[in-house]
């Protein structure tokens, strides 16, 4: 199966964002004046090249031969049996295997697209932020492939949790800059990357790793990941001659979920379910359930739901998963929540750890801790369902990077 071009097959989706970069009341550009010309330049370049045959041909060839797309749509037979009713009915569970991409996650779809764009814009220096390290690894990988200078900002706490990915980035020639400010996690790394971009905007392109940030990033990152949903549609039609009933994905910033959801936003019969990190519980102070518990505010250049205190100050997020440990969320997810098109729930660290083990033991697939949150929600979802609906879960990444973290919790010290 070949990958398909970026243009979505659901034309009315093109109505969001509007020309101001807004998804309803969310999104926009809340940035220093210094960055406005750079964002305008980026949007102009993106609109020019997204339909350019040469750009598309190069992107599709690299997605196929370098990344390894299309990724399989895998029927999880033993996971399905685990949730089956005594009469044999129950949800039919499929995994969209983004973990099989080069670098082990969905992140490379976007990193590759943005580097090809940066090259055409004449930028020789690339910066990025990373939490779990997968976006950093993907960016370092593509920069190595094209011989570009690469600087990755990563919180010191995340560097400890993801030491293997830090080594991978450095192995491929990237400079990894530790961020000690704040909680030393993804929010702080993003803030530091934006500061760098303000200072070096003439020579540097900032590859934001999620569907967050100022316009055009939420739109652009979504579009580079839309290949996930496009392949899923074709594979579902090929496998059973129809569409799925439910799509399920974890949500931190929300790029893997938007990549899967976007193709199906206008298919009103399909439930779109995002799963956030409840950490130690949504009624504690240690969680990252932004859409469940947040209020509207501005962070990193966009209006969206945020975790805030009574004074409107952004508060610390917590998750066992470094990739979900973020107090904001992409503005399109906020929009989909407000218009009632998508549903958002949360699972705890403990539930995610159990799901991490469950998928490993039942299917021989070790998922990323981020992905494990989506897997964990099956415990709640499956007993609620009638008949045998088809569920597709975005297996957004592999769990090699998390084995050390998980071992600390599961092996008595």
From Swiss-Prot:
<dbReference type="InterPro" id="IPR023026">
    <property type="entry name" value="Trp_synth_beta/beta-like"/>
</dbReference>
<comment type="similarity">
    <text>Belongs to the TrpB family.</text>
</comment>
<dbReference type="GO" id="GO:0004834">
    <property type="term" value="F:tryptophan synthase activity"/>
</dbReference>
<keyword id="KW-0028">Amino-acid biosynthesis</keyword>
<keyword id="KW-0663">Pyridoxal phosphate</keyword>
<comment type="subunit">
    <text>Tetramer of two alpha and two beta chains.</text>
</comment>
<comment type="pathway">
    <text>Amino-acid biosynthesis; L-tryptophan biosynthesis; L-tryptophan from chorismate: step 5/5.</text>
</comment>
<dbReference type="InterPro" id="IPR001926">
    <property type="entry name" value="TrpB-like_PALP"/>
</dbReference>
<dbReference type="GO" id="GO:0005737">
    <property type="term" value="C:cytoplasm"/>
</dbReference>
<dbReference type="InterPro" id="IPR006654">
    <property type="entry name" value="Trp_synth_beta"/>
</dbReference>
<feature type="modified residue" description="N6-(pyridoxal phosphate)lysine">
    <location>
        <position position="107"/>
    </location>
</feature>
<keyword id="KW-0822">Tryptophan biosynthesis</keyword>
<keyword id="KW-0057">Aromatic amino acid biosynthesis</keyword>
<dbReference type="InterPro" id="IPR036052">
    <property type="entry name" value="TrpB-like_PALP_sf"/>
</dbReference>
<protein>
    <recommendedName>
        <fullName>Tryptophan synthase beta chain</fullName>
        <ecNumber>4.2.1.20</ecNumber>
    </recommendedName>
</protein>
<dbReference type="Pfam" id="PF00291">
    <property type="entry name" value="PALP"/>
</dbReference>
<keyword id="KW-0456">Lyase</keyword>
<dbReference type="InterPro" id="IPR006653">
    <property type="entry name" value="Trp_synth_b_CS"/>
</dbReference>
<comment type="function">
    <text>The beta subunit is responsible for the synthesis of L-tryptophan from indole and L-serine.</text>
</comment>
């Amino acid at each position: 199966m070949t990958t398909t071009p970026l243009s979505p097959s659901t034309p009315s989706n093109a109505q969001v964002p509007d020309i101001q970069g807004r998804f309803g009341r969310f999104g926009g550009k809340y940035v220093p004046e210094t960055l406005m010309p750079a964002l305008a330049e980026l949007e102009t370049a993106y609109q020019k090249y997204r339909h350019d045959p040469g750009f598309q041909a190069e992107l599709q060839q690299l997605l196929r031969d370098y990344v390894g797309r299309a990724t399989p749509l895998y029927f999880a037979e033993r996971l399905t049996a685990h949730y089956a009713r005594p009469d044999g009915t129950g949800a039919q569970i499929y995994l969209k295997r983004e973990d099989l991409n080069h670098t082990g996650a969905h992140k490379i779809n976007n990193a590759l697209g943005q580097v090809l764009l940066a090259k055409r814009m004449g930028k020789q220096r690339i910066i990025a932020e990373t939490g779990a390290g997968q976006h950093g690894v993907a960016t370092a990988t593509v920069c190595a492939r094209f011989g570009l200078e690469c600087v990755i900002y990563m919180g010191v706490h995340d560097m400890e949790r993801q030491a293997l990915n830090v080594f991978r980035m450095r192995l491929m020639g990237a400079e990894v800059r530790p961020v000690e400010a704040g909680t030393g996690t993804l929010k702080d790394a993003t803030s530091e990357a934006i500061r760098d971009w303000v200072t070096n905007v003439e020579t540097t392109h900032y590859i934001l790793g999620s569907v967050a940030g100022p316009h055009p990033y939420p739109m652009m990152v979504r579009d580079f990941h839309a290949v996930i949903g496009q392949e899923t549609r074709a594979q579902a039609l090929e496998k059973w001659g129809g569409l799925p009933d439910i799509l399920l994905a974890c949500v931190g910033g929300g790029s893997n979920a938007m990549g899967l959801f976007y193709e199906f936003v206008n298919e009103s019969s399909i439930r779109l379910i995002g799963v956030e990190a409840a950490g130690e519980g949504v009624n504690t102070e240690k969680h990252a359930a932004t859409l469940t518990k947040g209020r509207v505010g501005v962070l990193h250049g966009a209006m969206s739901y945020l975790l805030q205190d009574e004074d409107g100050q952004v508060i610390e997020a917590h998750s066992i998963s470094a990739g979900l440990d973020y107090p904001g969320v992409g503005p399109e997810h906020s929009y989909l929540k407000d218009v009632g098109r998508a549903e958002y729930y949360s699972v705890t660290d403990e539930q995610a750890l159990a799901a991490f083990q469950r998928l490993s033991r039942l299917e021989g697939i070790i998922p990323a801790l981020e992905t494990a949150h989506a897997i964990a929600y099956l415990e709640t979802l499956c007993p609620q369902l009638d008949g045998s609906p088809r569920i597709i879960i975005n297996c957004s990444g592999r769990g090699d990077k998390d084995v050390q973290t998980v071992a600390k919790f599961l092996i008595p010290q």
